């Protein structure tokens, strides 16, 4: 987040297993103080129960990927890719919903009134006098690469296992 009173910006990183405030954690505390003034509830790791199971889910996807690589079955690749896409979509929707509830459940007794808003999941948004930026980190790119590799492997395996086309000889009728 950037604002005139914070020229260096205030940073918060959300990982699969933890929240980290920039500046040694002080930025998360600063964000929570600012949130208090607009009536938004505090951002705490305890409020994100998915942080407890996402690391295990990612480990499971890694193990399933290894199993699929060893046995190289097309149906296993399809199953793994579909499951991984569902997991990714569910995670994005859950994160968007979490951002929506944080920005729309504002206390009416707040010191500063701002209209309800949804912090950006990706991209930029101007909220009050802040420019809020939200961009994926390395983990998102690695997970996207994992899905891309699964998709490429699926295409390769499907082509390899497809029966060869038999040429048809046409005989002209006499």
Regions found by a protein language model. Give the residues of each.
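Hydrophobic alpha-helical transmembrane segments
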Residues: 49-68, 141-151
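Extended alpha-helical regions
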Residues: 51-62, 77, 160-174
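Long, glycine/tryptophan/cysteine-rich extracytoplasmic
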Residues: 1-49, 96-134
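Alpha-helical transmembrane segments of secretory-pathway, organelle, and plasma-membrane proteins
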Residues: 1-8, 83, 87-89, 94, ...
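Structural signature of transmembrane alpha-helix termini at the membrane-water interface
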Residues: 66-70, 93-100, 152-162
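Interfacial segments of alpha-helical transmembrane regions
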Residues: 65-91, 166-167
